[in-house]
Amino acid sequence: MKRKAFIVLIFLLSFAIRFSLEEYQKIILKGVNVEREKNNLKPLKIDNRLNKIAIVKAKDMTREKKMSHTSKKFGVTFNLIKKEGIFYTKAAENIASGHKTPEFVTERWLKSKGHRKNILERDYRFIGIGKATDNDGKIYWVQIFTN
């Protein structure tokens, strides 16, 4: 009986984790696209392969315990994009850490000149969004953009 209850608990937890990932991605995507619309730009579309890469990148930063565009393990994020077989001629990455909510990290990205430039780049059509939390509770956030 305990084994069956444990299996049900694991199933429910995996569903909850999956739901929360999708929810934060939707919130960030909405914030980004509202700002793009204000600037007469087409909305970005979620690319699940870019989401996967963004999550890998966020998890990598938790392992390294630092926010960086370059990883000891993967090099630059664009290596992961190429490895996944995604063709692009233009790409960018926004990263952040420490912000507790998707709304707040989006607000901070939009207030930063460089991050805002990536979000409002006319040529970008696709976005991947990821996050990971380290053992100390610090959250690392990633956005990846491609045309």
What are these regions (language model features)?
Residues 12-24:
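Bacterial Sec-dependent signal peptides at the C-terminal "C-region" and cleavage site
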Residues 93-147:
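Disulfide-stabilized extracellular recognition modules
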